[in-house]
C-alpha cells in the first residue's frame, strides 16, 4: 500500500502533507511554496495553469481565472444567493446545478476542484518519487452531505481514492494534540476562519482520544467577505472623487480585489496601509490613479458585523456540547483570517481568554489530514478520532413536518431506525423525502434526495410498518433505506451530490483528467522551455552589452544569430526546436564566458606582477608599515 497523503482543500489556499518517520511533513510545491493558491487559470492557447502561475494572470485575464470555487461546490444554482455575481468568471445554471463557463465549455465545481487536487497530488508525487493514489481530504465541519459528496467526487476525478473526508477543525486538533504525552483530559475549542468558511468545534482530548463534542459554523463567511468590504470602500471612494464607477470594469475590479487582500494582510501588523493603484482607469481627461489610506480602525469598523457573525456559532457550539466557556482549556486559531487582530477581541469576548497560537494556522489542517492518513494506513497507533455530524437528518412526514432521525452533533459513524406508516387507506407506495437541517418544517430544510418504496400491500391507513434507516459513514456521507416490515421489501439510496454528477459523468471526467494529464505535462514542458530560453536570451544580451569590445566581431555575430534563431522558434510551439536552439545559444554563450574569464585572469595576473614590484618607500628602506602601527598604539 502506498502513502496516504493529507490535503487541505482550501477556499484561498491548499496544502498537502505526508507522514514520514512517524512525523507529519508539509510538502513544498514546484514554486517553492508550502501552500498553493486554490486558483485555476485558463490560458489563451487553451492551456491550464494552477496555483501561483494562475494567480499571476488574475488581473490580465479575470474572466478565465477561477478562484474560491469551494464557495460553490455541492450547491444548487438557486442556493448561491448572489455570490455568483461577485466573481469575474461566469457561473451559469445547468438544470439545478452550478457550472463554470470558460470559452463556451462548461465545468462542474467538482472538475475545477479536481484541478487543484491534481496539483496537490503532483506536488506529493514529485516529493516522494512515486505515484500517489490515496488521500484524506478536509472539508469545513459545517459542510452538508452534498458538499462532502461533491468533494469526494472531486478527489475521484483527480485520480485519488479518498479514504476519508475529515472536518477541518478536527484535523487541526489532531495536529495540535499529536505526540503530546498528556494523560490529563483537555477541552479545546477550534476557531477556524478561512478564506470562505467559518467553523467552530469543541473537542475533548485525552490519552490519544480526540472526541468532537459539538460543531457549528457558517459556510459563507471568510476572508473573501472581508476583502469584499475593502473593495466596496475603494469603489465608493473612487466614484465619489472622480464620478467613475469601477464596478463594471472587470480588470479594474480584479486589481481592487488584489489590493484589498494585500491591505487586509498589511493591517494585521500595521495600524494603517497605503493603497496605490496607478492607471486604474481613464476618461476623456486622461488616466486616473487610485490612492487611499486605510487604517486598521476603519477596516474593523467596516467589517464589524462579519466579526460579530462568528460569535453566535461559538455560543451555540458551547451550548450543544453542554460546556461553559470557562471550562475551555485552550482555543486554537486556525485559518489565515485568524491573523486579523480583531479576532483576538472576539475570542476574549466569547471565551474569556486569549486564543492559542499552538499550531500554524495555514498548515495545521493539512498536517491533521496527514495524521489521519497515517491512522488509516496503520502508521499511527493509539489514536482514536470521534467526529460528529454537523446537521440533523430526517424525513418529511404528514403535514410537511421535518422529523429528525439523527440529531446534529451525533458521533459518527452512526445508524438510526424509526418505524413509520401510511397516511391514506389502500396506499401501496410511500415517497421518502430525505432532508438535512434544523428547521421544523420540511420545506425550510435542504433536500438531500427522494426515493419510493413500492409494492406495499393495500391496507388501512396506519397499518403498514415502514422502517426507515439512516446510516452515516465516517466521512459524514448519508445512506438511507426503507423497508416494509410486512413483506420484507426494501429500497436503498445513497444520497448523491446535489451537483447532479452521476457515476458515469464522474467516470467520464476521470478519463478526461487522465487524458489531459499528458497535455498538461506537455504544456508545463513548453512553459519551462520558454522560461529557460527567455532567461538565457536576457542573460546573454546583458553579458554582450557588459563585455563591449571584449568580444570579437565573429563571436558576436555568431551569438546574435543564435539569439535571433531562438527568438524565431519562441514565436511557435515546437518545444523540441526551442530546446535545440536554446542549446546552441547556451554553447555559444559558454564560449564568451570562457573568453571573458581568460581575459580577466590575464588582467589579474598582470595586476599581480605590478603589485609585486617594490614601492617607492620600500625601495628607500622606509619603515612605513611599522610606523603606522606604532602611531595606532600610541593613541
Swiss-Prot record:
One of the record's GO molecular function terms: ATP binding
Region (Disordered): 601-635
SS bonds (residue pairs): none
InterPro entries (UniProt xref): ATPase_NBD, Chaperone_DnaK, Heat_shock_70_CS, HSP70_C_sf, HSP70_peptide-bd_sf, Hsp_70_fam
CDD domains: ASKHA_NBD_HSP70_DnaK-like
Induction and repression of expression: By stress conditions e.g. heat shock.
Keyword ATP-binding: yes
Keywords: ATP-binding, Chaperone, Nucleotide-binding, Phosphoprotein, Stress response
Pfam families per record: HSP70
Highest taxon listed in the record's lineage: Bacteria
Modified residues (Phosphothreonine): 197
UniProt family annotation: Belongs to the heat shock protein 70 family.
Chain's role: Acts as a chaperone.
Protein name according to UniProt: Chaperone protein DnaK
Organism: Treponema pallidum (strain Nichols)
Lineage, opening ranks: Bacteria, Pseudomonadati, Spirochaetota, Spirochaetia, Spirochaetales
Recorded name of the encoding gene: dnaK
Amino acid at each position: 500500500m502506498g502513502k496516504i497523503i493529507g490535503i487541505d482543500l482550501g477556499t484561498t489556499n491548499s496544502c498537502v502533507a505526508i507522514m514520514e518517520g512517524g512525523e507529519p511533513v508539509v510538502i513544498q510545491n514546484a514554486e517553492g511554496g508550502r501552500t498553493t493558491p486554490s486558483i485555476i487559470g485558463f490560458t489563451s492557447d487553451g492551456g491550464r495553469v494552477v496555483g501561483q502561475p494562475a494567480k499571476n494572470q488574475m488581473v490580465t485575464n479575470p474572466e478565465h481565472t477561477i478562484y474560491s470555487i469551494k464557495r460553490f461546490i455541492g450547491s444548487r444554482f438557486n442556493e448561491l444567493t448572489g455570490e455568483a455575481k461577485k466573481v469575474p468568471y461566469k457561473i451559469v445554471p445547468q438544470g439545478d446545478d452550478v457550472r463554470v463557463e470558460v470559452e463556451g465549455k462548461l465545468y462542474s465545481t467538482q472538475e475545477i476542484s479536481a484541478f487543484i487536487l491534481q496539483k496537490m497530488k503532483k506536488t506529493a508525487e514529485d516529493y516522494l518519487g512515486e505515484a500517489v493514489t490515496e488521500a484524506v481530504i478536509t472539508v469545513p465541519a459545517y459542510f452538508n452531505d452534498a458538499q462532502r459528496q461533491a468533494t469526494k467526487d472531486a478527489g475521484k476525478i483527480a485520480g485519488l481514492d479518498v479514504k476519508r473526508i475529515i472536518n477541518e477543525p478536527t484535523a487541526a486538533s489532531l495536529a495540535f494534540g499529536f505526540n503530546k504525552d498528556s494523560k490529563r483530559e483537555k477541552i479545546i475549542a477550534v476557531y477556524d476562519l478561512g478564506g470562505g468558511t467559518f467553523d467552530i468545534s469543541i473537542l475533548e482530548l485525552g490519552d490519544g482520544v480526540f472526541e468532537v463534542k459539538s460543531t457549528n459554523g457558517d459556510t459563507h463567511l471568510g476572508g473573501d467577505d472581508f476583502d469584499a468590504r475593502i473593495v466596496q470602500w475603494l469603489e465608493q471612494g473612487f466614484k465619489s472623487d472622480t464620478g467613475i464607477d469601477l464596478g463594471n470594469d472587470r480588470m479594474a475590479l480584479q486589481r481592487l480585489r488584489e489590493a484589498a487582500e494585500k491591505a487586509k494582510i498589511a493591517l494585521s501588523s500595521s495600524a494603517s496601509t497605503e493603497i496605490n493603484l496607478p492607471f486604474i482607469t481613464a476618461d476623456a481627461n486622461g488616466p486616473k490613479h487610485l490612492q487611499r489610506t486605510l487604517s486598521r480602525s476603519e477596516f474593523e469598523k467596516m467589517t464589524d458585523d462579519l466579526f460579530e457573525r462568528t460569535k453566535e456559532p461559538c455560543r451555540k457550539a458551547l451550548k450543544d456540547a453542554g460546556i461553559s466557556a470557562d471550562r475551555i482549556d485552550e482555543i486554537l486559531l486556525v485559518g489565515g483570517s485568524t491573523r486579523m487582530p480583531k479576532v483576538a477581541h472576539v475570542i476574549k469576548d466569547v471565551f474569556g481568554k486569549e486564543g492559542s497560537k499552538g499550531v500554524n494556522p495555514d498548515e495545521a489542517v493539512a498536517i491533521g489530514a496527514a495524521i489521519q492518513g497515517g491512522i488509516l494506513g496503520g502508521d499511527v497507533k493509539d489514536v482514536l478520532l470521534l467526529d460528529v455530524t454537523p446537521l440533523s437528518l430526517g424525513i418529511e412526514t404528514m403535514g410537511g413536518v421535518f422529523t429528525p432521525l439523527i440529531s446534529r452533533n451525533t458521533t459518527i459513524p452512526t445508524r438510526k431506525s424509526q418505524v413509520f406508516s401510511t397516511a391514506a387507506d389502500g396506499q401501496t407506495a410511500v415517497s421518502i423525502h430525505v432532508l438535512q437541517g434544523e428547521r421544523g418544517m420540511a420545506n425550510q430544510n435542504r433536500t438531500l434526495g427522494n426515493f419510493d418504496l413500492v409494492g406495499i400491500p393495500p391496507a388501512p391507513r396506519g397499518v403498514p410498518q415502514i422502517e426507515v434507516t439512516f446510516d452515516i459513514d465516517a466521512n459524514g456521507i448519508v445512506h438511507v433505506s426503507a423497508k416494509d416490515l410486512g413483506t420484507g421489501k426494501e429500497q436503498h439510496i445513497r444520497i448523491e451530490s446535489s451537483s447532479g454528477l452521476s457515476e458515469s459523468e464522474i467516470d467520464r471526467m476521470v478519463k478526461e483528467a487522465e487524458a489531459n494529464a499528458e497535455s498538461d505535462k506537455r504544456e508545463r514542458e513548453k512553459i519551462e522551455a520558454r522560461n529557460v530560453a527567455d532567461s538565457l536570451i536576457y542573460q546573454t544580451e546583458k553579458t554582450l552589452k557588459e563585455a563591449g569590445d571584449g568580444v570579437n566581431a565573429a563571436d558576436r555575430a555568431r551569438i546574435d544569430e543564435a539569439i535571433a534563431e531562438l527568438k524565431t522558434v519562441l514565436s511557435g510551439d515546437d518545444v523540441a526546436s526551442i530546446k535545440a536552439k536554446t542549446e546552441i545559444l547556451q554553447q555559444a554563450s559558454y564560449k564568451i564566458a570562457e573568453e571573458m574569464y581568460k581575459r580577466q585572469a590575464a588582467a589579474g595576473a598582470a595586476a599581480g606582477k605590478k603589485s609585486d614590484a617594490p614601492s617607492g618607500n620600500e625601495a628607500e628602506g622606509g619603515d612605513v608599515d611599522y610606523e603606522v602601527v606604532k602611531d595606532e598604539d600610541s593613541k
